[in-house]
Regions:
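Protein kinase glycine-rich loop
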Residues: 41-47, 52
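Conserved short submotifs of the Hanks-type protein kinase catalytic core
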Residues: 106-119
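Catalytic-loop of the protein kinase fold
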Residues: 150-167, 172
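Conserved activation segment of eukaryotic-like protein kinases, specifically the C-terminal portion
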Residues: 199-212
């Protein structure tokens, strides 16, 4: 008599795990949400949570496709995509990278945004780079973006030179020749509401604000974490080079000390934005913009100012 093997219970059979499939160069992908089709190009960037590809839509717009990495389960990636899209749509602003579309294709999540020419980080590689030439134009756009985030109760938490971009806007009458330079704040993936702020949300270890390193000494985390980060970026532009600080240097106030050595009006504006104690730091983006237009306050005042 032939022994019968036990048959599996269909209810116990799990469906195959969904796998994200990256796009290939030249592939045309259509969004069911908008009907727009995107011809995929080369990989142009990569972050903690996504890979970015160049692409063009049917209107010949130069765009970027952020493809979310399959970190965690399909459900977790979908939740992350939905959260980021919600923020991008809610926080649409001329000084924040613009979102065009979002969709799922082959169990892979795409977020389509405008394509920027390069990050501010790449500007530092220009030969004989003079950051002071760029400081005020970048500050004007960046601070407007930060102001818009804050009045909508969001904090970016991760502002640095790789997350601020130069965008080239073409002249429709002379698209190959004339282009206007604009600056945009991007990567809102880790942005949080005011009541969701946590020390663990700040990603870049080299730019952790003092209040993250020692909240008992320097104060609680609030929206002024963005002011500190903007201050660090503008300090880099003022010195025309990338700067990195150890936690010990941040706690000792080295960024502020470097700001004090600058010429007016930068020394007053940036030393105030880079104060270690949150309660003495620049209150908001508008105040920092006004400080950048304030005449010299005097070296003695700066040296005696709260740190």
């Amino acid at each position: 008599m032939t022994e019968q093997l036990p048959q599996p219970n269909p209810q116990n059979i799990l469906p195959p795990a969904k796998m994200a499939i990256p796009p290939s160069i030249g592939e045309v992908i259509t969004s069911m949400a908008t009907g727009n089709s995107y011809t995929m190009g080369e990989k142009i960037g990569e972050g903690n949570f996504g890979v970015v590809y160049s692409c063009k839509d049917i209107w010949e717009n130069d765009l970027a496709a952020k493809v979310l990495k399959p970190i965690g389960t399909y459900e977790n990636v979908k939740a992350s995509a939905t959260e980021e899209l919600t923020k991008l749509v809610h926080l649409r602003n001329p000084h924040i990278t613009f979102v065009y579309d979002a969709f799922e294709f082959r169990d892979t999540f795409y977020i389509i945004t405008e394509r920027c020419y390069c990050s501010v980080k790449q500007l530092f590689s220009i030969q004989n780079f003079n950051g002071l030439t760029w400081l005020m134009p970048i500050a004007r756009s960046l601070l407007q973006a930060v102001h818009y985030l804050h009045i909508n109760n969001y904090v970016h938490q991760d502002i640095h030179s790789a997350n601020v971009f130069t965008a080239l806007v073409k002249d429709e009458m002379m698209p190959q020749d004339n282009k206007i330079v604009q600056f945009k704040l991007g990567d809102l993936g880790v942005a949080k509401l005011f009541n969701e702020l946590d020390a663990k949300n700040t990603r870049a270890q080299w730019m952790l604000p003092p209040e993250v390193l020692n909240p008992n000494e320097f104060g609680a985390i609030d929206r002024r974490i963005d002011i500190y980060h903007v201050g660090l970026l503008l300090l880099e532009l003022a010195y025309s080079k990338e700067l990195r600080f150890t936690p010990e240097e941040i706690i000792s106030g080295k960024p502020r000390e470097m700001a004090v050595q600058l010429q007016p009006p930068y020394h007053f504006a940036l030393e105030k934005a880079l104060r270690r104690h949150v309660s003495y730091r620049t209150a908001d983006a508008m105040e920092l913009w006004r400080d950048l237009h304030t005449p010299s306050q005097g070296t003695v005042v700066l040296l005696n100012a709260p740190k």
